[in-house]
Structures are given as structure tokens and as C-alpha cells.
From Swiss-Prot:
Protein name per UniProt: 3',5'-cyclic-AMP phosphodiesterase, isoforms N/G
Organism: Drosophila melanogaster
Positions annotated as active site in the UniProt record: 645
Domain PDEase: 569-898
UniProt region (Disordered), positions on chain: 31-333, 349-370, 400-429, 528-566, 920-983
Site, as annotated: Binds AMP, but not cAMP: 806
Statement: the UniProt record of this protein carries the keyword Hydrolase: yes
Pathway in which the depicted protein is active: Purine metabolism; 3',5'-cyclic AMP degradation; AMP from 3',5'-cyclic AMP: step 1/1
Residues that bind a divalent metal cation 2: 686
Bias type Basic and acidic residues, positions: 35-50
Assembly and oligomerization: Monomer.
């Protein structure tokens, strides 16, 4: 009984009872035209309308005067909401608010700016003389009160519920009394209250399920970018930005997607409201029960989770309530504007790379107010931009008003380019009319040409992939023409990062039609049979077994004691290791020192520390001892003899993945299951790597290549080994998961690891860039990430970026990784030389050009990838891009000049000698010498220069045996010089 009375008393204290205030204040009320009759209709219907209506309170003449205060706070808060108003259902219920800048008084600079798809001006009139009693409040101020048309009030359950619904980010009026009060009455009471009380009632309404018809169509989205908290509606793209971060319950209760927006999600007309709340020194604060607030907040969070769309299910269905299921609390990313910086080759003009005029991009910038300066390069986004331009041109040419049912805003970018002011009507005989009509036809023709090239079995992102490959091939062809080393680097990039899938012409495959070709192929096959037998790998284990899986060693892979190591490994240097592991959230950690301090167990300690710090062992129900058993077994299956692809590389990729997952733009986007799956994929992505490339395994007809049909051979093998190790006793870290959760995680891990195949690089890049630019062109600027395909695409690119993150690390780390990778390449080249195979590009230790290869690697592979990732999470990756550019400049400065400095004095003589040994030039020189009467001197000079040529040739041939450093072109040129000298 006492507890019940206490709760009732607390609720009474929390209820915002109306209080009489002594000082009157001028009230300004914005009403639709219609006079007193219309206002009477509103008052008549007020009794049946229980929904509070939003109002905006403004200070006088820009002064800091607030009608309401925020409890326990003396700071200034500014809240801006960009939502969507207008549209409505097909029945046209409710009118959209419309208007421009409304100036109430010359001395009062308050304005309410709205935009809508309706072309008529908003009929508001100014009502003055209305005063309200303010009680003990010591200041006078004015306020605006938005009142919607009676038709929208009578259609409250329809789609256009715009301003008749509750606004959690504004002050609201009382529900029952508002319509009964005459705005001219001085005894009217103020129904405003502080922000926390407003949020408290918002929580009560959410917990009670009010307005569920509209809230069921939204998914809450919280994405923090830069220094401010940003809440983004996944259904309409509105953003709520506060001066400081609020509590989770407060943010959830102010998910404004359905509060100021139509529920059918067809309106994208933006309306901006700005609310300022400033505390005053002598205001009486309204107190409420914190216990009730916390209870209702918990109910609100639980309700929001139940309403979240399941976004990471295998079947793209609705997720369950468990945190392990696909329903993520926030399912989207806010795309920001990008700064001006050095751009990759993807942003160069299409006309320089594509011969067909049908493939040239017509739009180089986005027709969007929020992303007006961002360039678009993907064909599908360019098609959308062109079609949007065609639509806007059609509206200008036909003078047809835009329909309220359209969810696309009116944009007159094309009209502006044609020299005509936006929104101005055009006459048929004007020059601007003819020019705009011609541009429209050209835009439409270009779109049709592009759409005709789309094949039915390919996605729209393949258009970007094919375009990027053509541009890269053109770039590499120019790069290879520069020098012999450039040709080698181009071959390496093409063979490694471009998929070998090609379109085959079926009739051309019929070789039996040409008997001569058949005979030639048979002879060539007999000649190469012996060489093929020598280059073929020895027979391995039966294909029914997974090669590389060792028998588990219980004495080294299991922990029998009660105490587990603090960082997962037993090491005498635990303090030093703990200091380094404390910086796991830092980009460019000293990973080599971690490998040293962890007794060559970097992967185990890094993975264990990350899973512990993220509380994934608890959320995913992983026993710590089982996790350590699996990680130790996994690390044992990494080949320690590999210079690069060993457990240290896996630890580096896992740590980089952890840092990228901590990106502020991705905060709260992914569930624990998704985060754990991405980290698990990073741990296993190179297990049992033989230190050889996929192309080598295919060329040598290895057992792995035969087993996986030459398709992502190593990546499939890594997955098979890792999931096989989970079947070892005491190693199944996912044993406590439900069957559906385990299937989801397995599919996710498979997709992520397969995406680490470097031949899929261009497809991954094209998919991500198409998705980002399409959302920008659409005008929303928000990636909803509300289905499995979009979410796994982001995670695939995240791990792929981590796998290619060495050039973005500090220069000492980068140089060390480069040396290890090149040594592994050289070992493969040595094996190819011994087997009589063709040496792969960049694998010949005698002709490698390390510096130039790194510059080409950054320019054509790493920079475009990280540029796109930085576009996605801007501005969180700007420091990484800066480091990448610095490292690129360093290697560019280290490229030996051509010719090298050591041969500067010899090169002019060598070039002169090459022309002297030519017959015609020699005769001319001898003739000139005979005419001068100095024949003997000329002969001695010729003999001396010839000896110099031979000496330089010998010195050049002797210097060609060294390693890389850009010596290959000079060595090849010197080897031909003795032949000239002997002529």
C-alpha cells in the first residue's frame, strides 16, 4: 500500500499541472486562412482530438528568452530537425504546409521556412493582441503556434499525419484544453513545459503503443559523425542533430520519423524547424520521479527493439528479438559531403577511356542540394541523375505542376544550366525553351543507350565494374609503355586484381572446323607434355579430405587450469604486452612488438583481447576457455615459415578490422553477431596459406585448384580449414548459438572471406561506389542498410580495406610489410624458376622494382578503395587517407631516375656509340675525317670508343645480377651493347 501511494504521489509530482502566471505576454498564432469560422471548426473538433500539436517558441529579437527550461541543465541546446512534410495518401486527405519566409514584424526576425511540392503559397495570417498568463515567469516573449487545417485533423488516421502528431523535439500543447481556449483570451493558460517532461510523455506514449501504425514503418537509426550526435530516420532521411549526446531513451523517444512525416513514406519535401532552449536564472524547475522515467525509458527501448526491422537475416526477413538476430538498433549510414583532395583515376573523364559516345557520362555532379559538389562516376547513378534532370526539364517545358503524390522534390538543376531561372515558366517560341528541349532529348537518348547495354543476368553494379576495368586497363597500358618495369607492374595488377572472367564467343570455340589448327595444337601439346609433367605438383592427399588440417595437440591447445592468461597467452613479458594491447583501438599499432612479446602468438592475444573488450564472449555466449582453445589451434595452422601470410598478418588484419568497426559513422549500426562474424572472418581469412598465389596453384594444377575449380582457391581452402577446426573437441566457440543464428553467421563469414580474393577487388569497389552514389543521387543521403545484401556489402569492403591497410599505416610499419611481401613473392619466383614455369610478375628477384610497384599499387588499387571507404564514413577516414598519400609520395621520391644517377656520365656516350656503329654514320664520320686530313687520329678515336663500349657493357652485365631497385631496364639495354660493338 505504501509503495502504491508513493508511485501515485510521484506521478502527481511529475504531471505538468497548469499553473497561473502573472505576467502576460504577446502571443502570435499562425492560422490557415478561413477566418473565425475556420477557427470555430477547430474548436468544435478539439474535444475529439487527443493528439498534441507542435508549436515553436522563439525568443524576442534574437535574445536568449525561453518559455520552458530543462531540468538539471544550464547549457544552451540547439536542435535542428529536417523531416518530410506533405505528400499524403491518394485520397488527398490533409493539406501540405507550404510557404516561404514569413516575417511577422520588421523588428522581430522570426521566420518559418518550409518547402513543399505544392505550388500555392501558404495562407497564414497574423493574430495579435493575444496574451497568456505566464505566472511567475519573469519575461515576456512571443511564440508561434502551428495549427493544421481541419481536414487534416479529421483525417488523423490517414497517411498525411504531418503536423497533427506528437513532436518529441518541440514543445507541445495540452491535449484537451487547447481547442477550447480563445486565442484572444488573456486568462488562457500556458501549456508549455520543459523538454524532459515532454520526453517523459513521449516515452509513455511509445510504451502504450500509441501511433503504432506509423511507428511500425520506421526503423530507428543512430549514427554519430564528427563531433555531434546524429539521429537519422531510415524511412525518410531526416536528421536530428543535437549539441551534445543524449541518453539512449531520450533519443529513442525522439525518433521523429513518423511524428512529422506522412506514414506512406512518399513525401521527400524537407521542412526545417529550429528550436532553442535556454535556461533562465530565476525559473522554477519542474520535478518528476526519476524512477518512473527510468522504467518508461526501459519500456521504450524494448519497444523500439521489437519494432526494428530484421536486417541481417539470411532470408532478408524480419529479425527476432534476441541481440544475436539480425535486428540492429540502427540500420543506416548518413552520407556526408566530401572535402576537396586528390582524386583517383576513377574520376577522370570517360571520353579519355571509352571510344563509344554512348558510354560517355553526361552528368559529372549530383543534382542534389545536400551533395551538389560531389562527383558521380558509376553509370547507374549517372542514369538516375539524367532521368531526374529529364523529369525536371519536362516540368519546365510543359508547365505541369508537380503532383503531391510524388516523393521526389522539385529540382530545377537543368533549367538553371540552361540559363533560365528555377521555376520560371517557358514559352514555346523562346530560345531557352528550344535549348532545354534539345538537352532533354539528349539526356533521354543517353539513358536509353546505357540501359540497352545492361544484360539481364548482371546487376547494375556490373556496369560500374566493367567501366572501372576498362579505365584501369587504359591506365595500365600507358603505365606499361613508360618502361619495362612498368609493364611488369601492369601485368601484376591485371593478373592479381582483375577477375579473369570474360565473355566468350561460342562459335569461335569450335576448333574442329580448322584442321590445321587442330594439328598445330596437337603438336604443341606433345612438346609441352614433358614440361607440364615437370611443373605439375606432386600428388597430395585424397580430395575427400581437407588438406592442411593437423591432428589436435591437447597439451598445447587446451587450458586445464582454472586461471586463464590475462591476454590469452602465457608470456614472461605480460606487462609490456598489456601496454601495447591497451592501444588496440589505435590505427597503426606496433603489431611486430606484439608478436615478439606474445611469444609468437599475436593472433591469439589480439583476438582474445578484442572479444573481451567488446564483450562478445558474453553476448555471443562463447566460453573463454573454448575460445582460447580454438584460437591456439587456428594459429597453429598458420604457416610460420611464410614471410608475409602468417599469423602476424592475420592479427594485423583483425586489429585493423576492429578499428574500422569503431568508426563513429558505424557506431550502433551492426549487431554483436555481425561484429563478431566480421572479426572471426578476419582471424581465419588466411589460415593454412601456402605462401603461393591462386594463379600459381591454378597454373600448376594443384589439388586445391582441382577441388575448387580454379575459383577463389585459397579463400575456399581457408574457410574449409577454419570450419573444420571448429569440429575439434573443445574448439566449437559457437556451440551455444541457435541453429538459425549459426547459419546466419556461417553465411556471413563465408561471404566476407571470399571477398578477400584480390581478383574480386574491382567488383567490390564498384558495388560499394554504386550503392553510395545511388543514395546521394536519390537525394536522401542515407544508406538504410535494411537488408542482408547491403549490410554484408559494407562488411565485405571493411575487411577488404583491413586486408589492404598496410600502405595506410605509418611508414616504418609499411616498409617492413613491403619487405616481407616481396620476399614471399621472390620465394614463389624461385620455385617457378626451378619448375621451369613462367615467372609471375613481381616474383623475379633479379628484375623487381619495389618502389615503382608500390606507387602503382597505391594509385590503381589502394587509393580508389580507401577513397570510396572514406566517402562512406566521412570524415572518419581522412587521417588514413593523409597517411596513404604521404607514403605514396615517399615511394615516389625513392624511384631511381631514368637513367640512374650512377650512369649519368656514361649514358650520353652509350647513346652516341649506338649511332656510331651504324654503317651510314661511320662512313660519314670517316669521310669528314679524311677531308680534314686527320685519318689516323680518327681511327684511334674509333678504337677507343669501341673499347669503352665493351667495358660499359661488361660492367652493366655484371651489375644486373643484383636485386630490385629499378635496374631491370638498364641491364636489358646493356646486354645488347656488345653485339653492336662487335659489328
Amino acid at each position: 500500500m505504501i509503495a502504491t501511494l508513493f508511485i501515485i504521489f510521484a506521478f502527481i509530482r511529475a504531471f505538468p499541472w497548469s499553473r497561473k502566471r502573472g505576467r502576460p505576454a504577446l502571443a502570435l498564432t499562425l492560422m490557415p486562412e478561413g477566418g473565425e469560422d475556420h477557427r470555430g471548426d477547430l474548436n468544435q473538433k478539439g474535444e475529439n482530438n487527443n493528439r498534441p500539436r507542435p508549436s515553436i517558441s522563439l525568443a524576442n529579437n534574437g535574445e536568449a528568452m525561453a518559455p520552458r527550461t530543462r531540468r538539471k541543465s544550464s547549457k544552451f541546446h540547439e536542435v535542428t530537425f529536417s523531416g518530410s512534410v506533405g505528400g499524403g495518401d491518394s485520397d488527398g486527405g490533409g493539406e501540405a504546409i507550404n510557404g516561404g519566409n514569413l516575417d511577422v514584424s520588421p523588428s522581430k526576425r522570426h521566420s518559418l521556412s518550409t518547402t513543399t511540392s505544392n505550388s500555392s503559397s501558404a495562407p497564414y495570417r497574423y493574430l495579435s493582441g493575444s496574451s497568456r498568463s505566464r505566472g511567475s515567469r519573469g519575461d515576456c516573449h512571443e511564440y508561434y503556434q502551428l495549427q493544421q487545417h481541419s481536414s487534416s485533423l479529421s483525417n488523423g488516421n490517414r497517411g498525411n499525419r504531418g503536423l497533427s502528431q506528437r513532436s518529441d523535439t518541440m514543445a507541445t500543447e495540452a491535449e484537451g484544453e487547447e481547442f477550447d481556449v480563445d486565442p484572444m483570451d488573456e486568462d488562457d493558460e500556458d501549456q508549455t513545459y520543459d523538454r524532459e517532461t515532454e520526453e517523459f510523455y513521449s516515452n509513455i506514449q511509445d510504451a502504450a503503443g500509441t501511433g503504432s501504425s506509423s511507428r511500425s514503418k520506421r526503423s530507428s537509426l543512430f549514427s554519430r559523425s564528427d563531433s555531434s550526435a546524429t539521429t537519422t530516420s531510415s524511412s525518410g532521411g531526416g536528421t536530428f542533430t543535437g549539441g551534445k549526446r543524449r541518453s539512449a531513451a531520450s533519443i529513442l523517444s525522439s525518433s521523429m520519423c513518423s511524428d512529422l512525416m506522412t506514414s506512406d513514406r512518399r513525401s521527400s519535401t524537407a521542412t526545417e524547424y529550429s528550436v532553442k532552449s535556454v535556461t533562465t536564472g530565476n525559473t522554477s524547475q519542474r520535478r518528476s520521479s526519476g524512477r518512473i522515467r527510468r522504467y518508461v525509458s526501459r519500456m521504450t527501448i524494448a519497444g523500439a527493439r521489437r519494432r526494428t526491422t530484421g536486417s541481417f537475416d539470411v532470408e532478408n526477413g524480419q529479425g527476432a528479438r534476441s541481440p544475436l538476430e539480425g535486428g540492429s538498433p540502427s540500420a543506416g549510414l548518413v552520407l556526408q559531403n566530401l572535402p576537396q583532395r586528390r582524386e583517383s583515376f576513377l574520376y577522370r573523364s570517360d571520353s579519355d577511356f571509352e571510344m563509344s559516345p554512348k558510354s560517355m557520362s553526361r552528368n559529372s555532379s549530383i543534382a542534389s542540394e545536400s551533395h551538389g559538389e560531389d562527383l558521380i562516376v558509376t553509370p547507374f547513378a549517372q542514369i538516375l541523375a539524367s532521368l531526374r534532370s529529364v523529369r525536371n526539364n519536362l516540368l519546365s517545358l510543359t508547365n505541369v505542376p508537380a503532383s503531391n503524390k510524388s516523393r521526389r522534390p522539385n529540382q530545377s538543376s537543368s533549367a538553371s544550366r540552361s540559363g533560365n531561372p528555377p521555376g520560371a515558366p517557358l514559352s514555346q517560341g523562346e530560345e531557352a525553351y528550344t535549348r532545354l528541349a534539345t538537352d532533354t532529348i539528349e539526356e533521354l537518348d543517353w539513358c536509353l543507350d546505357q540501359l540497352e547495354t545492361i544484360q539481364t543476368h548482371r546487376s547494375v553494379s556490373d556496369m560500374a565494374s566493367l567501366k572501372f576495368k576498362r579505365m584501369l586497363n587504359k591506365e595500365l597500358s600507358h603505365f606499361s609503355e613508360s618502361s619495362r618495369s612498368g609493364n611488369q607492374i601492369s601485368e601484376y595488377i591485371c593478373s592479381t586484381f582483375l577477375d579473369k572472367q570474360q565473355e566468350f564467343d561460342l562459335p569461335s570455340l569450335r576448333v574442329e572446323d580448322n584442321p590445321e589448327l587442330v594439328a598445330a595444337n596437337a603438336a604443341a601439346g606433345q612438346q609441352s607434355a614433358g614440361q607440364y609433367a615437370r611443373s605439375r605438383s606432386p600428388r597430395g592427399p585424397p580430395m575427400s579430405q581437407i588438406s592442411g588440417v593437423k591432428r589436435p595437440l591437447s597439451h598445447t591447445n587446451s587450458f586445464t587450469g582454472e586461471r586463464l592468461p590475462t591476454f590469452g597467452v602465457e608470456t614472461p613479458r605480460e606487462n609490456e604486452l598489456g601496454t601495447l594491447l591497451g592501444e588496440l583501438d589505435t590505427w597503426g599499432i606496433q603489431i611486430f612488438s606484439i608478436g615478439e612479446f606474445s611469444v609468437n602468438r599475436p593472433l591469439t592475444c589480439v583476438a582474445y583481447t578484442i572479444f573481451q573488450s567488446r564483450e562478445l564472449l558474453t553476448s555471443l555466449m562463447i566460453p573463454p576457455k573454448t575460445f582460447l582453445n580454438f584460437m591456439s589451434t587456428l594459429e597453429d595452422h598458420y604457416v610460420k615459415d611464410n614471410p608475409f601470410h602468417n599469423s602476424l598478418h592475420a592479427a594485423d588484419v583483425t586489429q585493423s578490422t576492429n578499428v574500422l568497426l569503431n568508426t563513429p559513422a558505424l557506431e550502433g549500426v551492426f549487431t554483436p553477431l555481425e561484429v563478431g562474424g566480421a572479426l572471426f572472418a578476419a582471424c581465419i581469412h588466411d589460415v593454412d596459406h601456402p605462401g603461393l598465389t591462386n594463379q600459381f596453384l591454378v597454373n600448376s594444377s594443384s589439388e586445391l585448384a582441382l577441388m575448387y575449380n580454379d575459383e577463389s582457391v585459397l579463400e575456399n581452402h581457408h574457410l574449409a580449414v577454419a570450419f573444420k577446426l571448429l569440429q575439434n573437441q573443445g574448439c566449437d566457440i559457437f556451440c551455444n548459438m541457435q541453429k538459425k543464428q549459426r547459419q546466419t553467421l556461417r553465411k556471413m563469414v563465408i561471404d566476407i572471406v571470399l571477398s578477400t580474393d584480390m581478383s574480386k577487388h574491382m567488383s567490390l569497389l564498384a558495388d560499394l561506389k554504386t550503392m553510395v552514389e545511388t543514395k546521394k543521387v536519390a537525394g536522401s543521403g542515407v544508406l538504410l542498410l535494411d537488408n542482408y545484401t547491403d549490410r554484408i556489402q559494407v562488411l565485405e569492403n571493411l575487411v577488404h580495406c583491413a586486408d589492404l591497410s598496410n600502405p595506410t599505416k605509418p611508414l616504418p610499419l609499411y616498409k617492413r610489410w613491403v619487405a616481407l611481401l616481396m620476399e614471399e613473392f621472390f620465394l614463389q619466383g624461385d620455385k617457378e624458376r626451378e619448375s621451369g614455369m613462367d615467372i609471375s610478375p613481381m616474383c623475379d628477384r633479379h628484375n623487381a622494382t619495389i618502389e615503382k610497384s608500390q606507387v602503382g599499387f597505391i594509385d590503381y588499387i589502394v587509393h580508389p578503395l580507401w577513397e570510396t571507404w572514406a566517402d562512406l564514413v566521412h570524415p572518419d577516414a581522412q587521417d588514413i587517407l593523409d597517411t596513404l598519400e604521404e607514403n605514396r609520395d615517399y615511394y615516389q621520391s625513392m624511384i631511381p631516375p631514368s637513367p640512374p644517377p650512377s650512369g649519368v656520365d656514361e649514358n650520353p656516350q652509350e647513346d652516341r656509340i649506338r649511332f656510331q656503329v651504324t654503317l651510314e654514320e661511320s662512313d660519314q664520320e670517316n669521310l669528314a675525317e679524311l677531308e680534314e686530313g686527320d685519318e689516323s687520329g680518327g681511327e684511334s678515336t674509333t678504337t677507343g670508343t669501341t673499347g669503352t663500349t665493351a667495358a660499359s657493357a661488361l660492367s652493366g652485365a655484371g651489375g644486373g645480377g643484383g636485386g630490385g631497385g629499378g635496374m631491370a631496364p638498364r641491364t636489358g639495354g646493356c646486354q645488347n651493347q656488345p653485339q653492336h660493338g662487335g659489328m
